[in-house]
Amino acid sequence: MDVTRFTHPIDLRAVSITDPFWQRETELVRREVIPYQWEALNDRIPGAEKSWCMHNFRLAGRIMAQYRQQGAQYTPQAYTYRGYDALPDDPAHPDEDKFYGFVFQDTDFSKWIEAVGYSLIQHPDEALEATADEAIDVVCAAQTPEGYLDTYYIINGMDGVFQNLRDHHELYCLGHLIEGAVSYYQATGKDKLLRAACRFADYVADFFGTADGQCKGYPGHEIAEMALVRLYEVTKDEKYLRLSRFFINERGQEPNYFVEEERRNAEREHRPVRSVNLAYHQAVKPVREQDEAMGHAVRAVYLYSGMADVARMTGDDSLKSACERLWRNIVQEKLYITGGIGATQIGEAFSYAYDLPNDTAYSETCAAIGLAFFARRMLQMSPQREYGDVMELALYNTVLSGMALDGKSFFYVNPLSVVPSACHADSRLQHVKTVRQKWFGCACCPPNIARIVSSIAAYAFTENEDTLLTHLYLGGSIRKTFPTGTLTLSIASDMPWDGHITVTLHADAPVSGMLGFRLPGWCPNPNVTADKPVRVVDGYAYLSGEWHDGETIVLDFPMPVRLNRANNRVREDMRQVAVTRGPVTFCAEQADNGENLHLLRVDVEDFGKDGEGVQVLPDSRFGHRTVKLLVPGFRQQEDAEGALYAPYQSAAESPCQIELIPYYAWCNRGEGEMRVWLNV
């Protein structure tokens, strides 16, 4: 592996987003989502589930203040098990001296501050920065003198620290703290939170490792692996890279740490040993031997992202090969057409090959975000069209579906078929919400959306010394410094609705360098027009040479409306089709088509080979410009009540136009049915 050719995300300061789509999304996060989520973290959203996040930090800070005041006279609390999700007996009158929420509740803050950092990089805001500084003071006051920082154990008793890595998320909290601290440091230059994150990471590095007396465990919920690599990149302290590599290398080794941990805990708690679902934790075998994505989907893709980071930083071919195998397994057998992953609510997990149900789909928002993390890291090592295609699919569909268009309500799961009456009556669908929620007790998804949307430019563009790669077509300006000078790209784009993109180059003097552009897989006949030769490798068009002020590159990506079928191993989608245009997956909604969407079928003949029979119309009903599709079809006549079964005969049906909207925009007009896969 030639690590010198790998790329890294572009500095957000070098990008200004002006296109109508992503500018709206990033501005929504800046103006609405970040302030709203700060209120949620402080339990000030009427009618929403409480976060308890800042409550816990303030309580932990008071405990640490007592510790500092009393010194040797301080008597620490013996560990009291509070459960995985601790709630007050009387929600209206919570105890001020108790931890509430999930064991990982601290991460609500960490993801919020990460989004704040990205936003401040692009839009300095004194008031927001002051709020963030006050929050950081509260969080840092909770840290122990030794560097440990997890409010669950600081409040409930430190003698339980690192005794339940499988379930209690301390290393997950570390990972998100690092990500947030790095983002805020890069935005403001203020290092208070970064120093706190480093102290916690140092505490962990002393505790874990292969030396005598060190713990050979690893995270139950992965993210520390990629966060530690990021901390290494900022601090240049190789200890953090070594720790990440240790966690990855140790996972799944025999004797299995999680099995041994369970035996120890059962003995200490005087209870029978319970079975450990190693697949759920991606710990069935060492990571380099894994070839199937399994278990909790978010944990899995966070692990794979960390593996890709370590492979990139260390030149580890065996780790890169494992990432490639796991990637292929996901995209060939376990990926929804909306870019979602994790088919089953049982364990929020990947299911078996080709098991992709629509109405019971879990497809967690965080899992799609994690898939985008994984894709971007694979692109950094090896620019291949498929990685960019899947990243784009996840971002434009499941990720954005997770947040309402006003930024104030959210989906945790993202099914591809919803019938509200069924969801309300069927306990098998209890995980499916028919409208977005103001907040969640387990609120991993809302701040996750905020942090990826506010850093979208880092997914669109990566670079190394002499190359700039464009993976997503965001309109705006991008400044790239090559060894011979600085080149600014002005990109005129109306993606995802129009595939005509013009890149105009600006430079004070001639600049030499390479530019690469992804040729999307959804476009059958991409065209690149420029004054330089175009070389296509792995679905990327490369142009290199000396660039002059005013040169243009025109990319034309025709966007036919496509009728898609699933592999016939996907039983749930037999004799059904899904409609896509460009990177956007479309769906039918009750608001446009009435009830009983299962009675609709697409007229495949009139649809046309390239969607000639489909009307593509502008649509401004959702507060910003989108398109809607009018698809030729039929509606079957609804049977009368009475006989449940009858002799077969062709059903009576009448022609109709099926109106489709972008999947991400569904359920912004009230509760109603929705369906992605339509009958034929």
What is the predicted function of each stretch?
Residues 510-530:
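Beta-strand-rich binding/interaction modules
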Residues 1-108, 133-153:
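Low-complexity, Ser/Thr/Pro/Gly-enriched N-terminal "stalk/linker" regions
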Residues 5, 10-12, 19, 120-133, ...:
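Structural helix-adjacent loops and short alpha-helical linkers that scaffold large soluble proteins
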Residues 3-6, 67-70, 93-109, 160-173, ...:
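Solvent-exposed loop and edge beta-strand segments that line ligand/cofactor-binding
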Residues 14, 244, 323, 389-397, ...:
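C-terminal beta-rich recognition modules with glycine/proline-rich loops and embedded aromatic residues
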Residues 22, 113-126, 175-190, 224-236, ...:
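Well-ordered alpha-helical scaffold segments within catalytic/enzyme domains
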Residues 523-544, 562-569:
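Solvent-exposed beta-strand/loop surfaces of large extracellular or lumenal domains
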Residues 156-234:
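A conserved hydrophobic secondary-structure block that centers on an alpha-helix together
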